[in-house]
């Protein structure tokens, strides 16, 4: 029999921090054109909300060896009241995000019985740092269009290098309504050398894809992350990306990418990142499942 223990629930109001990302869904104008009341918040923000539970339960140990599988089921709009809840089931944390009042939003009122807007399973443990993999195909020199992504045999994308600084890490914590203490930092501010907020990893993943692909309008639907060793604010990180699958779906092109986050000679984290490239496919109104 599974041992279950409820973790403290939390109420918050969704905050859109992705208005300048270039994705039309993250602006009021672009989201309204697709049938939403307000801008759709970035998936990395919801990811950050859900990471609060393993961070508070396991602290820095989770960033050293742990993982999370986040599934984004229904778009969340800016200023939407949310309820976070979770329980420990045996050795896993199972968390969810739900709407507190769907009827406050005309677009949400069209979708009865939404259920959880996002779900996550988090775990503690996993292998240590891995050696970087080698890519069998030379990355393209220019951005790929979605048509090229769908029809080409290219399975690797250009790598990209980042050095997440204090300002980046602090802004990410602010957007996910988290505090530095969630990372195991004793002060309320992030400093160079402190643990990297997990949402910064997803931010780097998005930027790496935006650097390599002409994305247009897209929806983040899933991120499965495994930490192999702790990344820190100020680290020099190379992100290498390869395409796992691309196929047509009901709402657009469905693609799955694998990204390695490399410091020095070791893969410190790996993300399986899924997205739907809609090209306006949601113009007839919001969808209740992604």
Task: Locate each region found by the language model.
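Hydrophobic beta-strand-centered segment that forms part of the acyl-chain substrate-binding groove
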Residues: 45-92, 198-246, 270
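HotDog/MaoC-like acyl-thioester-processing domains
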Residues: 1-15, 72, 77-158, 227-290
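Hot-dog-fold acyl-thioester-processing enzymes
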Residues: 1-65, 128-222, 280-290
